[in-house]
A protein has these predicted regions:
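Acetyl-CoA-dependent GNAT
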Residues: 3-69, 80-86, 90, 138-141
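Conserved GNAT acetyl-CoA-binding A-motif
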Residues: 87-98, 121
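Residue-level recognition of the GNAT/N-acetyltransferase active site
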Residues: 67, 71, 100-102, 127
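Conserved acetyl-CoA-binding loop-helix of GNAT-fold acetyltransferases
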Residues: 72-86, 104-113
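Conserved catalytic-core motifs of GNAT/GCN5-like acyltransferases
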Residues: 98, 116-132
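Conserved acetyl-CoA-binding loop of GNAT-fold acetyltransferases
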Residues: 111-120, 141
Length: 141
């Protein structure tokens, strides 16, 4: 991700989430040494992105989104796979994420990619209020 991508990512946030990140919050990730963000582009347009933070070899996927016009075309899957490979190169040993319990397409994708449910966070999401499923994938370097 570069600073040029930030406005498009912020717009994508508003298309995909009930509680979107602000442009300022996204831009601050560029300065965070713990963060890794990847984008999928088509021409000059950001059609998807994924962001993570890693501390002491444990990574947390903070956000992943694909433009509604580009869903079900493998963009999200490619982003998560690319993130995993980049994290392995940084010697991370696992990737954890939260997903809305009602987000069946995302849960199905994560399970396909080898993530397993390891817990729940009660009332984690707002607008509407909903539990988060915690999923994790571990690997050996």
């Amino acid at each position: 991700m570069t600073s040029e991508h930030v406005p498009q990512i912020a717009h994508l946030e508003t298309l995909c989430f009930h509680d979107p990140w602000s442009e300022k919050s996204i831009a601050s990730e560029l300065e965070n040494a713990l963060s890794l963000w990847l984008v999928a582009v088509e021409g000059d347009d950001v059609i998807g992105y994924v962001g993570s933070q890693t501390v002491l070899g444990w990574s947390d996927m903070m956000n992943v989104a694909v433009h509604p016009d580009h869903r079900r075309k493998g963009v999200g899957e490619s982003l998560v796979i690319a993130l995993e490979e980049a994290l392995k190169a940084q010697e991370s040993t696992c990737l954890t994420l939260e997903v809305r319990g009602s987000n069946d397409p995302a849960r199905t994708l994560y399970e396909k990619l080898g993530f397993a449910e390891v817990g729940r966070r009660k009332n984690y999401y707002r607008n509407p209020k909903e539990d988060a499923l915690i999923m994790r994938k571990e690997w050996v370097l």
